[in-house]
A protein has these predicted regions:
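Single-stranded nucleic acid-binding proteins centered on OB/S1-type folds
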Residues: 1-166
Length: 166
């Protein structure tokens, strides 16, 4: 008998063998110390999301498999405490792919896209938000402020003035 799917909400450190049906909501590449790894946001059929980390050693294996808006069955991954400085998900854990992680059933699941939870500017200004959690905002770029280079880096900082459209 096939192992049933579990929900992202149920992911914890109490076990190692998981089987989830997910949709890739977002994907990006992180470069650190001249090494690249992939990070993603998975969402399940209940709309629950979780941050996912694919280490450098597995990047080549999954880079040509995982795409935004595709659905997958993902098994055998490592849940770890979400201690990231800036969290993309409220889930207390992140999923880390390991050598035994398997991805299959491409686009065989019916999973809607992640619901965006827009935060009004008034709540942000009043401090009514978690400062370690990234939030969704929608607004109009009213003005582009000054640009400057970060000291000792090639990174550029650009300040934007946003206008709330609510």
């Amino acid at each position: 008998m096939a192992k049933p799917f579990e929900k992202i909400n149920d992911i914890n450190k109490m076990k190692e063998l998981w089987k989830i049906a997910v949709k890739v909501h977002h994907q990006w590449t992180v470069i650190s110390n001249n090494k690249e790894h992939i990070e993603l946001i998975f969402v399940d059929a209940n709309g629950t999301d979780v941050h996912v980390i694919l280490p450098t050693t597995l990047k080549a294996t999954f880079d040509s498999v995982l795409f935004v808006n595709n659905t997958y069955t993902v098994t055998n991954f490592l849940p770890q405490i979400n201690d990231l400085m800036f969290k993309t998900s409220e889930h207390p854990f992140v999923i880390r792919f390991i050598a035994g992680t398997r991805v299959s059933d491409i686009n065989k699941h019916e999973i809607p896209g992640k619901r965006l939870n827009f935060k009004p500017f008034s709540e942000i200004i009043s401090g009514n938000w978690r400062n370690d959690l990234l939030v969704d905002v929608i607004g109009l770029v009213e003005e582009i402020g000054y640009k400057h280079m970060s000291a000792g880096s090639k990174k550029q900082q650009v300040n934007l003035i946003l206008k709330d459209l609510v």
